[in-house]
Regions:
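Gram-negative bacterial Sec-dependent N-terminal signal peptides
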Residues: 1-16
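Boundary regions of SH3-family modules and the immediately adjacent low-complexity/disordered segments
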Residues: 19-31, 58, 67, 80-122, ...
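Short, flexible beta-strand-to-coil junctions
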Residues: 71-72, 82-83, 157-165, 173-175, ...
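Acidic, glycine-anchored loop motifs typical of Ca2+
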Residues: 145-156, 200-203
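Short aromatic loop motif centered on NTY/YTY
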Residues: 160-161, 179-258
Length: 310
């Protein structure tokens, strides 16, 4: 009996140590180390909000492409999936289906004003103009379908906003089944952006720069008549750029690294909750940036001028 318990313990330990990726990833020698390495999932993966677990962000099927962004000193890896969502990788033993983004049909409404990727099996592209009288922007009746993974029908209405801010509102079809001529902006139902992924399983994805500094990928869960954001640990940016001013990086290696004006840089991540937004002020960013020498660190730019926040 004692030998059996030892054997089971060894099997469990080996299972827990099974590789998550097709490449070997070693623990870093510092709290966080940037890798930026493309790989594949060696098993089904669950991306979580925290390094040791926490709420789920996304599920990835085995053999799917991933990019390993960061590794901590305990060997936990922060990755992004093919869509661009980030999370800490864990082995997914739940048997739950992976996020469904492949095979969706692309449709466009309003002269490229809005782009949708949807599943025609559970939703119908309407491509109708609902309203747009006087100086109000045109409202597009874009889709109708079962978007929450159940039998409930939803409409998707979109408009460009009074100041050119594209947004879409997702709401249950009224009891009489008729399509309203308009719908009001609702913080619980309306998302900013022009590109949407609607697989029909209760998840809604956006890929947009509307009201944002960088192109950002987000995920929401549709529950009843509300949309709830799925919180990612970081937002992936992945943009090559040039420094508009000289600034200093707080390096992941604990050192300070200068970046000269005009130097090529790569903006990797945004930590969206590092600096809480203040009312009536432009929200500040905390960006993970790599300089031309390959040094990686954090910087808080002045969002008014583009300079480093002193």
């Amino acid at each position: 009996m004692h030998k059996t318990l030892i054997a089971l313990t060894l099997i469990a330990a080996q299972a827990s140590a099974a590789p998550l990726f097709s490449d070997d990833i070693a623990a870093g020698k510092q709290p966080l180390t940037y890798l930026g390495k493309d790989s594949k999932a060696a098993t089904a993966l669950l991306l979580t909000q925290k390094a040791d677990g926490g709420d789920a962000v996304a599920r990835i099927a085995a053999d799917s492409p991933v990019t390993i962004l960061l590794v901590d000193d305990k060997g936990h890896a922060l990755v992004k999936n093919a869509f661009g969502l980030t999370g800490w990788a864990q082995a997914d033993t739940s048997g739950a289906a992976a996020d469904k983004l492949d095979g969706l049909q692309k449709v466009v409404i309003g002269e490229d004003a809005f782009i949708f990727y949807h599943d025609p099996k559970n939703s119908t592209f309407l491509n109708e103009i609902a309203s747009g009288k006087d100086e109000e922007p045109e409202t597009y009746r874009a889709l109708r379908g079962k978007l929450a993974g159940d039998d409930k029908d939803y409409f998707v209405y979109c408009d460009q906003g009074m100041s050119g801010d594209p947004n879409c509102t997702i709401f249950p079809v009224p009891a009489d089944g008729k399509a309203p001529t308009e719908t009001a902006y609702d913080e619980n139902r309306t998302l900013n952006g022009e590109t949407y992924y609607l697989p029909g399983d209760g998840s809604v994805y956006t890929d947009t720069q509307a009201n944002l500094f960088y192109q950002t990928r987000s995920k929401y869960t549709l529950k009843g008549d509300k949309l709830e954001e799925v919180i990612q640990p970081y937002h992936y940016i992945g943009v090559d750029s040039k420094a508009e001013n000289t600034f200093t990086l707080d390096g992941l290696d604990g050192k300070k690294h200068k970046v000269k004006k005009g130097e090529k840089v790569r903006v990797i991540l945004d930590d969206p909750r590092a600096i809480p937004c203040k009312e009536d002020e432009i929200c500040k960013l905390k960006l993970l940036v790599q300089n031309a020498a390959g040094d990686t660190g954090w910087v808080i730019p002045d969002t008014y001028s583009g300079e480093e926040d002193k």
